[in-house]
């Protein structure tokens, strides 16, 4: 399906909604999202910051030709330059941003009471998060998912030797071994445990950014050690969360990349992140 066909699919979804056929609109929107995700999954991944920046730069003339919002185009160019320099794009460089669901107008920081282009009211503006990881799930769901990961992680290594666990398998995410993927999850668990502690101790904690990549230290440990350390850290964190006051979940910390982040968002982020890596680790296990 071409990009033009994809736009036509979204137009059909809009037409169905305008005519009152909301469930048909829903199905058409699902089809469009499925097409996008399938294309992203099957395409050749960009594995370096430089390659990503070059791909964005190559797309910029088409975006300008589409007459997109000038502030958006400027922000994209600055963000691309930041990535090319090997840096993360900060929240200050890319703050809260909204898109009008009616006409596609862009609004930064706060949606206007009335869209200056189509006249739609403020409530039709769609907030675009930095990542779907930050879209909060209900606390009981998040807690249940965080609690299940240690058992899942233990099961994925069941019956494997250390040699098998260390064998790298190429894929959409690049070459990873189960040992490296589990080490990455342990690294991120230590990070979320630290941030949970910060939320419990402070009303508005400073959530210092940290790259979520494989911990060098975990390379020295066996797979069994990684799984054990993950379980101990996760279970201790869950005890803290279960005893936390209800209002603690709505506390908001400050993150250099994401801006304001609540405890609920932070825990949702890491639960979803683990679910994302489950697909990767299942694929690696099947290839061994």
Where do the language-model regions lie?
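General detector of N-terminal leader/presequence modules that precede the first folded domain
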Residues: 1-42, 150, 154, 234
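Long, charge-rich boundary regions
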Residues: 6, 36, 42, 128-199
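Short cysteine-rich clusters marking metal-coordination/redox-active sites
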Residues: 100-103, 115-118
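A short small-residue
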Residues: 130-133, 211-219
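Hydrophobic packing residues in well-ordered alpha-helices of helical domains and bundles
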Residues: 146, 178, 223-230, 267-270
